[in-house]
Amino acid sequence: MRTATKLLLLSLIIVFTACQKEIDYATSNNSGGTGGTGGTNNTSNIEGDYDFVNMAAHTESSVTVDASGIQVKAVTVSDYVTRSNTGTMKITADQLISTNLGYSIDTIINVKTYMDNVLFDDSDVPFTGTTPPSSSTSTYVRNSADSITVTGAIGVADPSGVTPTGPVGVKLSWSGDTLLLKINSNFTQSVSQGGVPGTMVGSVNGTLRLKKH
């Protein structure tokens, strides 16, 4: 029973972490995010051409399923900075246009497993993944000099194949010639793995870095 349950949870974690790897999500309930703290540099005009530098994220999620009458919950925490980053982004007055954006992730996920609210296992699980280069166009509206709301994927299409929805709040700041897009987003969605239904609740604190040409 212990081995079978652990294998089920590991398969759930792998699938759901793939969904987490994006800053934007297809979810049943997305709070829209609050963004970061922003900066003091002038972000009133961000139009231009950029290279994708990387994306850093802290993710937390809780997946709960009912396995043969036992409530099983996996709580995962991960931190990563993307590698092998490729692609460009063009920002217009109301669009984010990405071309051939891609990256890889190589990190460790901490997983705490609970059975009927009793800690069953605490493990560090290696996770690697690659998002092949892809192109997309997202729209945005300006909220203030350092804040926008984006609808659609921010740069990279969701590797799970699900169409992102949004909207997501984004705070803007500069670090030299690099534009920082900061997102704090909470989400809830129904999930299924191997025919077992469940609920996933999570949050992402991420920063997308774009270097201006």
Residue ranges of model-derived segments:
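Contiguous, well-ordered beta-strand patches that form the walls/edges
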Residues: M55-S62, D79-N184, Q189-G194, V204-H213
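A generic short-segment signal for beta-strand/edge and adjacent turn/coil regions
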Residues: T17, A57-T59, A67-S68
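Generic intrinsically disordered, low-complexity segments enriched for polar/acidic and small residues
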Residues: L12-I13, E22, E47, N100, ...
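Bacterial Sec-dependent N-terminal signal peptides
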Residues: R2-L7, I13-V53, L210-H213
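Acidic, glycine-anchored loop motifs typical of Ca2+
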Residues: V65-T76
